[in-house]
Amino acid sequence: MNIRIGIVGYGNLARGVEASVQLQPDMELIGVFSRRQGIETVSGVPTYTMEDIPNFKGKIDVMVLCGGSATDLIEQTPMVTKYFNCIDSFDTHARIPEHFANVDKVAKEAKTATLISCGWDPGMFSLQRVYAEAILPKGKSYTFWGRGVSQGHSDAIRRIDGVLDARQYTVPKKQYLEAIRNGETPDVDGYKGHLRECYVVAAPDADKAKIENEIKTMENYFVGYETVVNFISQEELDRDHKGIPHGGFVLRSGESTEGTRHVIEYSLKLDSNPEFTGSALVAYARGLYRLAKHGGTGCYTVFDIPPAWISTQSAEELRAHSL
């Protein structure tokens, strides 16, 4: 029997999940649940309202929650966990412990299993950090993001008065990447290691100097970063910045014995951030389904799912072909 999937929300991430489910031999998409009325899905799967969610209890094995981290998932993941096993991509790193505790309480009471903070960071990058630090306990870890579009930062710029549209790219500084690859351990954090590159379409009568200042002084987004603001036309933005690429690097530079150095590097280059994140969610939905079948309840992360459980291959096939 196929794993029955539901999707909550229908933005770019949800469409990425929808596309990935179509590629899976052991899954079927039951429906999309949205606050918006009358939407049409790419695959033609039926759409329902958020109020319909409880009616599908027992008809969906895993709900994939595709809302934003700032306001949606904080509320929606615990709410939907009352009825279903769920997976989300909650990515506000500082609030993960709080989100985990809230979801864990609900899931244990409901006897459901929910996996939070899945994707590529948090998610795939999180796993690589743990592997690298376990293998090289004496060393230093680094994470770089980009070059890619930061959707949250782009949205933050678009909320500024006088801004019609915007894209913000996170760009890793190459000098630090090269130093680490050479076995060095530079003193660099996320702020120092990245450039924030902004492309902004301003209204004709907007005060561009004021907009630039608002961007550069925005707490939790741009303060502390080297930030460059470029004002361009809507035509230029549509022509040159229409995609949603992203990527990044996890590196660890360390020693096994004095003077014997090793560098571990894991990298991603993504044409579409939401499509890749959606693909990760779908793979881990399979792992979560299997965990729940083994009696798991409560809240989990990618650290808790055995790699074999996210694969469509049997244990025998994995040993024969991937080990």
Go through the PLM ranges and name each one:
Residues 4, 15-16, 23-53, 149-285:
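C-terminal substrate-binding/catalytic lobe of Rossmann-fold NAD(P)-dependent oxidoreductases
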Residues 53-62, 70-89:
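Rossmann-fold NAD(P) dinucleotide-binding segment
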Residues 88-89, 114-118, 144, 167-168:
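General beta-strand structural signal in soluble alpha/beta enzymes
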Residues 258, 262-323:
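NAD(P)-dependent Rossmann-like dehydrogenase/reductase catalytic/cofactor-binding core
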